[in-house]
């Protein structure tokens, strides 16, 4: 089976003085998260589309879905204390409700990346089925510098080898669950990226090409850019 999990656990602290998490802010008349969900319901390969949200925002999320989304595959669950725990909550939900099979995969995506394309979703599904672990990336445009002391440059990696991470990140569910459960509590605090967990466990993580417009809306500037993208698509 193929599942999607939209990660809607962000608090929106970088968005400034707003009274709700950023995924619920309006984008051309609809909450950002609705734009994101709409991209996933267009894909009929998903058995369920899981929305993982903070406990205090479950009812609000359900109300939004009733208003905008008419697809019985969409369900809302409580997210975890951090990103990886939220992913695991999605897997635990599937395990409890349907059981886990060896080839079950989950496509995890940021709720605040509303411009994901059908192509990116399809490639994540196909590559996760084949390779087990997938990350979505775009080539780095700017030169990246590393500073281990936060004062002087300690390294400048070759730009041609550097990519910027996006989402989705997609996984064989049994495999990522096993690797996560093998971590110590301290490791769980340090390893905040699920793909890093796979790498440390010796798994190869397949790259899927993302897109320049697959932006993450985390700041007021990002929201302005997102509105401009939507307006441009309306005009065209």
From Swiss-Prot:
Pathway: Cell wall biogenesis; poly(ribitol phosphate) teichoic acid biosynthesis
Enzyme class: transferase
CDD domains linked to this entry: CDP-ME_synthetase
Gene Ontology annotations of biological process type: cell wall organization; isoprenoid biosynthetic process; poly(ribitol phosphate) teichoic acid biosynthetic process
InterPro entries documented for this protein: IspD/TarI, IspD/TarI_cytidylyltransf_bact, ISPD_synthase_CS, Nucleotide-diphossugar_trans, TarI
Site (Transition state stabilizer): 14, 22
Sequence positions that bind CTP: 7-10, 80-86
Reaction(s) catalysed (UniProt annotation): D-ribitol 5-phosphate + CTP + H(+) = CDP-L-ribitol + diphosphate
Keyword Cell wall biogenesis/degradation: yes
Pfam families from the UniProt entry: IspD (PF01128)
One example GO MF annotation: D-ribitol-5-phosphate cytidylyltransferase activity
UniProt keyword Protease, yes or no: no
Domain of life (superkingdom): Bacteria
Alphabetized UniProt keyword annotations: Cell wall biogenesis/degradation, Nucleotidyltransferase, Teichoic acid biosynthesis, Transferase
Residue numbers marked as site, Positions ribitol 5-phosphate for the nucleophilic attack: 159, 216
Signal peptide segment: none
The enzyme's E.C. designation: 2.7.7.40
Disulfide bridges in this chain: none
Entry similarity comment: Belongs to the IspD/TarI cytidylyltransferase family. TarI subfamily.
NCBIfam families referenced in this protein's UniProt entry, alphabetically: PRK00155.1-3
Function: Catalyzes the transfer of the cytidylyl group of CTP to D-ribitol 5-phosphate.
Name recorded for this polypeptide: Ribitol-5-phosphate cytidylyltransferase
Lineage of the organism: Bacteria, Bacillati, Bacillota, Bacilli, Bacillales
């Amino acid at each position: 089976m193929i599942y999607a999990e939209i990660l809607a656990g962000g608090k929106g602290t970088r968005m400034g003085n707003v009274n709700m998490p950023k995924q619920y802010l309006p984008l051309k008349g609809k909450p950002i998260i609705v734009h994101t969900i709409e991209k996933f319901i267009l894909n009929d390969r998903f058995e369920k589309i899981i929305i993982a949200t903070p406990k205090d925002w479950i009812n609000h999320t359900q109300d939004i879905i009733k208003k905008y989304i008419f697809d019985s595959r969409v369900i809302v669950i409580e997210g975890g204390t951090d990103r990886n725990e939220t992913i695991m909550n999605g897997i635990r939900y599937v395990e409890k409700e349907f059981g886990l099979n060896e080839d079950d995969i989950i496509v995890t995506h940021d709720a605040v990346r509303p411009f994901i394309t059908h192509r990116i979703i399809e490639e994540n599904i196909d590559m996760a089925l084949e390779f087990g672990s997938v990350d979505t990336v775009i080539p780095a445009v700017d030169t990246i510098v590393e500073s281990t002391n936060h004062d002087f440059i300690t390294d400048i990696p070759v730009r041609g080898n550097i990519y910027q991470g996006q989402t989705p990140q997609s996984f064989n569910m049994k495999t990522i669950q096993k690797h996560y459960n093998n971590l110590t509590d301290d490791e769980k605090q340090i390893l905040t990226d699920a793909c890093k967990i796979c790498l440390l466990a010796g798994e190869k993580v397949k790259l899927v090409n993302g897109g320049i417009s697959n932006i993450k809306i985390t700041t007021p500037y990002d929201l302005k850019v997102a509105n401009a993208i939507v307006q441009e698509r309306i005009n065209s």
